[in-house]
A protein has these predicted regions:
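Transmembrane helix-loop-helix hairpins in multi-pass inner-membrane proteins
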Residues: 1-43, 94-205, 290, 294-353
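Membrane-interface helix starts
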Residues: 13, 17, 47-56, 225-239
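Hydrophobic/aromatic residues in alpha-helical transmembrane segments
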Residues: 26, 66-74, 110, 248-255, ...
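Short, membrane-interfacial amphipathic segments enriched in basic
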Residues: 31, 202-220
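A short amphipathic helical element positioned immediately N-terminal to and/or at the very start
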Residues: 39-47, 216-229
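Hydrophobic alpha-helical transmembrane segments
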Residues: 53-57, 84, 88-89, 125, ...
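Membrane-embedded helical hairpins/re-entrant loop segments and their flanking transmembrane helices
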Residues: 66-96, 255-277
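Transmembrane helical segments that form the transport core of multi-pass membrane transport proteins
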Residues: 224, 228-281
Length: 353
């Protein structure tokens, strides 16, 4: 038994190291591709004003307020005693573990902290996966709407990339559609069970994982059926997600407008066009399977914006965007995780006494 457990630990460590190696490789490729612009990029970053840093910090808080409210809306439907503050804290817990584990620990952390708040694990699993699916579908719809509104600008500026952009959008829509179908269409569970039985016959060692996946799918569909009965709740979730994405998508515009010598009138695009390009970068990066989106967001963002701006400006903006959407939430989340651990230890001591 101990040998089996140690094997699992070694396997998880190996997976993490492979992810880390893959991320380092991606970042190395990005550095090699843009090393000629590094000096100019560092100069651009050194000119960032304290006001911009404050705006970036506020955008992180607003994003997690929205994310926490989304969690609360979903959980509150069946567990009215769940407080809003727990949802806000849960958002930062997930952000910390998402970065610390390169993406794989976010879902586990979300389910774990929902369970600590009194939500049974099966329900917490279904709720978290439903929230993830709503997130993906909302992002795809928002990005598609912005793409259509600014289509003339995108067609004129990126005619060479248009085929790839449309192909990427098709991928985004397929992923969102499949996730939505898995969560809501009853026969999808039957199809997945048939596939699991086929795989189980070929690979008996997969029995435990396939059984666990089957249970999670059943929990997801049960929670989805319950939540889909409330159209007003779905509308609120969609609008909250749009507001949440907006707090991220305005970051490049703020950075570009506050660069020395640049103002809104000096840029080759309007606020809406910049907003749409950022949304497009984030959505298309989701099609590329990289840990926590590291490397893919940077590559797509830089590829699009460097056709309109000097490469150094595009690189400095994407670095600040990544800092705000990944590193800063992780740093703030670390304090939330530490605080939760301290509170848990105090509770255990009181119980022991």
């Amino acid at each position: 038994m101990m040998r089996h457990d140690s094997g699992k630990v070694l396997s998880s460590i190996l997976k993490y190291l492979l992810k880390l190696l893959f991320v380092c490789l991606l970042l190395g490729i990005l550095y090699y591709s843009f090393k000629d612009s590094m000096e100019d990029m560092i100069t651009e970053l050194s000119k960032v004003s304290p006001q911009v840093i404050l705006v970036l910090f506020l955008s992180v808080i607003l994003y997690h307020l929205c994310e926490g409210h989304i969690t609360w809306l979903i959980v509150h439907k069946t567990h009215p005693e769940y407080p809003r503050l727990k949802g806000f804290c849960n958002a930062f817990y997930c952000s910390f573990y998402k970065t610390a584990t390169l993406g794989s620990g976010s879902g586990i952390a979300g389910i774990y902290y929902l369970n600590k708040a009194g939500i049974p694990v099966p329900n917490a699993t279904g709720m978290y996966f439903f929230q993830y699916i709503v997130h993906k579908v909302s992002m795809a719809v928002y990005s598609l709407l912005l793409f259509l509104v600014t289509y003339r600008f995108i067609h004129t500026s990126f005619a060479y990339y248009q085929g790839y952009i449309l192909l990427g959008f098709a991928g985004v829509c397929v992923i969102a559609g499949v996730l939505l179908a898995v969560a809501t269409v009853p026969w999808m569970q039957t199809a997945c069970n048939l596939l699991a039985n086929h795989l189980r016959a070929k690979h008996p060692s997969w029995e435990e994982k396939l059984t666990g996946a089957g249970h999670k799918l059943a929990q997801l569909q049960a929670e989805s059926r319950s939540l889909l009965k409330d159209p007003l709740l779905l509308l609120r979730l969609f609008l909250c997600n749009l507001l949440k994405f907006t707090t991220w998508y305005i970051i490049p515009w703020m950075v570009f407008c506050n660069s020395p010598g640049d103002g809104p009138g000096d840029l080759p695009f309007s606020f809406l066009q910049c907003f749409a390009l950022t949304s497009l970068s984030q959505s298309l990066a989701g099609v590329i399977p990289t840990p926590a989106g590291i490397g893919s967001v940077e590559a797509v963002f830089t590829l699009l914006f460097r056709r309109l701006l000097p490469e150094a400006k595009a690189l400095s903006a994407v670095l600040l965007y990544r800092f705000t959407t990944m590193l800063l939430p992780c740093a703030i989340g670390a304090f939330f995780v530490l605080g939760e651990r301290i509170v848990s230890l105090h509770r255990k001591k009181r119980t022991a006494d």
